[in-house]
Amino acid sequence: MRPGCDLLLRAAATVTAAIMSDSDSEEDSSGGGPFTLAGILFGNISGAGQLEGESVLDDECKKHLAGLGALGLGSLITELTANEELTGTGGALVNDEGWIRSTEDAVDYSDINEVAEDESQRHQQTMGSLQPLYHSDYDEDDYDADCEDIDCKLMPPPPPPPGPMKKDKDQDAITCVSESGEDIILPSIIAPSFLASEKVDFSSYSDSESEMGPQEATQAESEDGKLTLPLAGIMQHDATKLLPSVTELFPEFRPGKVLRFLHLFGPGKNVPSVWRSARRKRKKHRELIQEEQIQEVECSVESEVSQKSLWNYDYAPPPPPEQCLADDEITMMVPVESKFSQSTGDVDKVTDTKPRVAEWRYGPARLWYDMLGVSEDGSGFDYGFKLRKTQHEPVIKSRMMEEFRKLEESNGTDLLADENFLMVTQLHWEDSIIWDGEDIKHKGTKPQGASLAGWLPSIKTRNVMAYNVQQGFAPTLDDDKPWYSIFPIDNEDLVYGRWEDNIIWDAQAMPRLLEPPVLALDPNDENLILEIPDEKEEATSNSPSKESKKESSLKKSRILLGKTGVIREEPQQNMSQPEVKDPWNLSNDEYYFPKQQGLRGTFGGNIIQHSIPAMELWQPFFPTHMGPIKIRQFHRPPLKKYSFGALSQPGPHSVQPLLKHIKKKAKMREQERQASGGGELFFMRTPQDLTGKDGDLILAEYSEENGPLMMQVGMATKIKNYYKRKPGKDPGAPDCKYGETVYCHTSPFLGSLHPGQLLQALENNLFRAPVYLHKMPETDFLIIRTRQGYYIRELVDIFVVGQQCPLFEVPGPNSRRANMHIRDFLQVFIYRLFWKSKDRPRRIRMEDIKKAFPSHSESSIRKRLKLCADFKRTGMDSNWWVLKSDFRLPTEEEIRAKVSPEQCCAYYSMIAAKQRLKDAGYGEKSFFAPEEENEEDFQMKIDDEVHAAPWNTTRAFIAAMKGKCLLEVTGVADPTGCGEGFSYVKIPNKPTQQKDDKEPQAVKKTVTGTDADLRRLSLKNAKQLLRKFGVPEEEIKKLSRWEVIDVVRTMSTEQAHSGEGPMSKFARGSRFSVAEHQERYKEECQRIFDLQNKVLSSTEVLSTDTDSISAEDSDFEEMGKNIENMLQNKKTSSQLSREWEEQERKELRRMLLVAGSAASGNNHRDDVTASMTSLKSSATGHCLKIYRTFRDEEGKEYVRCETVRKPAVIDAYVRIRTTKDEKFIQKFALFDEKHREEMRKERRRIQEQLRRLKRNQEKEKLKGPPEKKPKKMKERPDLKLKCGACGAIGHMRTNKFCPLYYQTNVPPSKPVAMTEEQEEELEKTVIHNDNEELIKVEGTKIVFGKQLIENVHEVRRKSLVLKFPKQQLPPKKKRRVGTTVHCDYLNIPHKSIHRRRTDPMVTLSSILESIINDMRDLPNTHPFHTPVNAKVVKDYYKIITRPMDLQTLRENVRKCLYPSREEFREHLELIVKNSATYNGPKHSLTQISQSMLDLCDEKLKEKEDKLARLEKAINPLLDDDDQVAFSFILDNIVTQKMMAVPDSWPFHHPVNKKFVPDYYKMIVNPVDLETIRKNISKHKYQSRESFLDDVNLILANSVKYNGPESQYTKTAQEIVNICYQTITEYDEHLTQLEKDICTAKEAALEEAELESLDPMTPGPYTSQPPDMYDTNTSLSTSRDASVFQDESNLSVLDISTATPEKQMCQGQGRLGEEDSDVDVEGYDDEEEDGKPKPPAPEGGDGDLADEEEGTVQQPEASVLYEDLLISEGEDDEEDAGSDEEGDNPFSAIQLSESGSDSDVGYGGIRPKQPFMLQHASGEHKDGHGK
């Protein structure tokens, strides 16, 4: 219904209510009883105002109810009935019975069914809430003196109806009121232009209105005002002037016309809703009062009189526009102005001097405008129209209105009413209403009506598809075409635009001049074709418009679901068209891009060079024929029995070592390489080169039992190390012993590499497979067996090869590729035979070929031979095949190209797999390769074993890598069988139903029409559901209804899949999109890839003894197969029962038909009549109605009608009825009924069992985990047991009753196998009881899910694993060194004892971690091992602000966060404080924590000396040597302050002589910051003055070379200023250090004079280098591993005891060093004769003592050096860090008061350099400068 009609109905309903209420009021007043309006709340009210009938209220309640009149309810009736006789509707409108008399054209709405929402209640409530203005003449009347005042105070009533007026005013009021004929006020018809042209003056309703003299003009103005200002009657005079009229707010408003809401509230208009918050429900008497109030207000507006009312408003003057900021909404809604147009309202702005150009001037009609001479700005162009004169407008309007009024009066109707233009009034649609389908059944549907409506739903055509089929439209396969509406597209300009204003009614009297329109094309207009659409091929028209439209409509809900984390946010893919190629780009770059459609990205070079025998397919390595026995032993050959040679004879045989042979062979090859000119040389040229007796040897163990592709002997492969860089700064790939490093961005495997991950892989032309390096056990070795004897050699490394990624497709049996390979292989063999022939012309025999290819027929061989040779029957070449004289034999390269070794390997793999299938019982037809067209159907039908055949797996993998399909990933083709490998089985790209039972989809057949139907879910309930799901309120408000429903459905489905959704009824089946399906596929591939890497790289030794019996395994496998077959046809019990019933019905029908045919022979006449009846029933198409009488439980009979429409059933029924008697039919029916009853009972019994099972499962869920029953104590101790710990009888050492069980020195016992309780817990975690799909009961069958069987196997496998402690294993026997000469390979080469030194921070951390382990071993310390669980102890973290535990302590230690003992002990002490705070100081847990602290103090005290040395090495400021601290501060000044100056980079390093060749000619003493840092590291500066001299030299050099005004000089000046400023900050500290250094130097010199000569050091009279006593040389000894140079020849002598000669020597040793990462202390290397041995460089032999002259002998070893040595049991990889600051020796330490920083990393120790005495003459000049 239209909105206008809706308003008329509401108005009529309101008038009816008002009239009825008036009549009631009259009756009530005549009744004379006290009227209690509140009684309507409890029932009907009588005429006396009392409750009718037997009320539920007693007298006391009625008194209370009457007392509610004090709330003002009574005054409402009194106010309404006070002036009822003055309303103007007299007795003329009332009939004899007191009801309102109906008019002649009244319509009866009593039986109307449509319920319209009552919008008028909101308006009435707002009108009633406004405070009325009372008048003196009404106040003087006394209606109810007692209670009126109280009522008015408590609840002010609405204003009463208008009072009595003067005689002349009564006429106006009557015309205003009764113009519509009734008591309702309807505005008169006045044109809006007339209303807008008049200035209406309104005044409020005042007391003295009776004295005003009315005039016609004022009456008209008042009438206009009340039409356009509906609230003017209750507003003050001043306020009404500020109010806009209705026509200003709503230009489409027409007084007296039906409201067009579509025009009033157009799209985009935001009209304030005044009544939005008002309550909706009001009683009818309240509506009546408010309706009359509106009438009174609208009729009582007097515009001429302007007298002051009781209220006065003082308004401030309106602010000027420049002080008001425009509202954002107004700014947004304002129309966008043309860039050429200029605002006319801006008077203050100076008009632009540029000429304005009209938009339409230079458009499509420019030619015509030019011909007419129209100016550029378009001024003066009016089309020749003329404006109408405004002074005659009222006269013309009044004349027109008079003419229309007369015409309407003559016709009796309103001809121009909007209703007359509607199609519903112009068409006789009532004639097309179908009241009864039987009446028009013979007519059929009208085609013209159906075509107008698109399609009409009927019994036969319920939807468009059925209608199209009926109309003869063939259904197309192109379902992806965009959907178009069957209705025409609305023209928005016609629907929403004001086009009627542009109609030219009179060209000489235009209301306004029209401006030429501007043509604007809307690209979104579907009626416009702006470009020629692309033609799409009919076969491949997969248009994504359907999905894109769906995606765009769900965009908001998808964004919200992504925010809440239900679905993963995917980056939006740009589906736009590819970019058009630039015509000027002539580079043809696209032809040089790497091909994307290739199978593998060739990371690095992939050229594989096989050996020559492999390339030429030599006979033993590439056999031409293999029998069944050889094929079964494919790549597993047994040991041969030799017929001759040393091993052919029995007896003992010696085993020869190969060490000398390997060295000899390597030397020979090196000589050959040198002789050929160096470079790389290919040595694999003969079969002898392929032996394993020389060269390097590794083993590779394949993890697959039968790999899809295997290399033959002599084929090459590469080891590639795939590395994926880390984002940001990447340290580079770690070094590997084997292989070449390849940096890859995309992974070459099914799973992707993680950033920073390196994975080694075997790669060749056949496959790519990940490999995992493992250390060979020392007890393993290799025996090589030849005819001559046995040879033994060591094995170093072994690789485990993961699952292969095939790169070469294996041909299927009897496929075209396989047959072509056989043909080519034979042809190549023939060619090579000809090449080997020494005869001329070349000739070969047929027997040689038949011997090599015994399976080939002679005819096929002859066919190959005829291409190149002729068979000679006579002559010298009789019985030979001679090469044709005109045939050119292919060269070796051509032959190699014809058949490659890879093709042979693929063929061998095919025949080996074919033989395995044959042995398994599969026939030839079961594994034939399918044709390409039927491949999809074929894949669904073949067996699992055939699925795993290599021709299927390789084809599937290669197709998946090309993007043609996906892989099953987990399934039958998994080579591991336990889910740790990929199953290369094809599945389509689009998601399908999974075969296995892991995620069963529930049958959603009962959704439509139930409470689970999302269409019936109200918006309020849907939003409440979203709140339960945790969606924020602001996000919910942004969504529309269907977006909310979409989010509910998606989140319910997600929670139902995860098994935690409470609202699972709204969940839907997981119909994934293709993108979601691909995402799940990638995640599954990544999971299996990571699992495979983890399993195959693990060094854990698994036990193979599982005590399993093969019979049990076979039983389990058979059971699993049966269960899988049962699960393939998934049917519920109801479906099975329906099938049984259907089978029995068919059986009964067959029996009846057989019986009927048997009886037909006896009664031929009946048969004839039956056939005639059936013929008649079949021919006429009538239906058969069978009336069956039933009896219910109470014994009453009722009849059901059953209609049969199928002719066959009708014939059978009629035949039975005519041929059989009643007893026979009842007997069969009773049998059928009995059987059905038994089936019902059986079904009920099974359903009851299921309900009981579910109930028990729910009880177990609520009950929680079962409590462990305490084990019963044995009454007697078992006297056979004797404890191994305490020696007592009756228990074991692992029993808790042993008194020594809790002692700390006893190692904690480890369980060998799982206990029964642990197995039960594992079953609960693995097998979930809440999964109802694991066990199904279908009918009388119990179906187990596949997941259940797998979980049982998992529990069984884990329970059979045995764990043995390492201490209880027998010690390995050490291998004795052989004494024979040939066992030289057993001689272990001499290892240098220069072991690696680790970072002191790592050493300290390892000591602290050992202390933590000791504390963990203390008894009863378990509560402190891990952080406190906040769920168990809820208030712990409210009381304890700094929690700490041993696990957190261990993590901090491993992160190297404790550079000193104090910080470690402080955190440990925090555990004690926390326990005392929470538990109390006397609590047992506090005592335990105190014992942990005591143990820590004891351990720290034991290692105090070692820890002190390590702390000094970590933090140089803690060192005893003041020189170290002084140099540390200076280095920090250089690195952190001076180098941080902006644009100071030219001074960081020496000037490059290549770039600035004349610099060193001008600058004699160059210096730079790097040189200063090197001097600092050499301790060259013992005072600030020497340091500042070098810093000032930088500035002086820059001034000298660049000039004082240069930018470089300014930067140098800034560096010097920063240096002076920083030194001033550390002035006090540096001054003290300088004094200490000077004091130590003087003390050392004095003591050196008194000290006697030491034999290990040069004496004072020994000749020394000239500047040995240079003051710049350091006098101190360092123990800082991260600060100094290599001090391997320094001792641990203190400064006080060191001689000056030693100090000078040590300082001299630093002068030549340039590295900043240094060793800490000297070595303790002594040869057997006791002489100290100089250190060897890294990797050297340690024999430099005789080769170097002037080396200094080493003092005794340093204690700290021994602390930092890595022992054999420690990990060697912990000091792999690197100095991030380049060569900054102090980068790891920051200046602070405590002198330590726990968050910094420490650089590694660089390898030690050989120490040499160096003379400083000319070698130690100042560095370069700027």
Curated annotation (Swiss-Prot):
Protein name in the entry: Transcription initiation factor TFIID subunit 1-like
Motif (Nuclear localization signal): 1370-1377
Compartmental location: Nucleus
Biased composition range(s): Acidic residues: 1714-1729, 1740-1750, 1768-1783
Protein family membership: Belongs to the TAF1 family.
Major location (coarse): nucleus
Residue segments, region Disordered: 118-141, 532-555, 1252-1276, 1648-1826
GO biological process: male meiotic nuclear division; positive regulation of DNA-templated transcription; regulation of transcription by RNA polymerase II; RNA polymerase II preinitiation complex assembly
Domain Bromo: start-end pairs: 1395-1503, 1517-1626
UniProt tissue specificity: Testis specific, expressed apparently in germ cells.
Assembly with partners or alone: Can bind directly to TATA-box binding protein (TBP). Interacts (via bromo domains) with acetylated lysine residues on the N-terminus of histone H1.4, H2A, H2B, H3 and H4 (in vitro).
InterPro entries in the record: Bromodomain, Bromodomain-like_sf, Bromodomain_CS, TAF1, TAF1_animal, TAF1_HAT_dom, TAF_II_230-bd, TAFII-230_TBP-bd_sf
Biased composition (Polar residues): 1660-1700, 1787-1797
Outcome of swapping L750F: In a lung adenocarcinoma sample; somatic mutation
Biased composition (Basic and acidic residues): 1252-1268, 1817-1826
Effect annotated for changing H1549Y: In a glioblastoma multiforme sample; somatic mutation
Biological role: May act as a functional substitute for TAF1/TAFII250 during male meiosis, when sex chromosomes are transcriptionally silenced.
Species per Swiss-Prot/TrEMBL record: Homo sapiens (Human)
Keywords: Bromodomain, Cell cycle, DNA-binding, Nucleus, Repeat, Transcription, Transcription regulation
Gene: TAF1L
One cellular component term from this protein's GO annotations in UniProt: nucleoplasm
Pfam families xref list: Bromodomain, DUF3591, TBP-binding, zf-CCHC_6
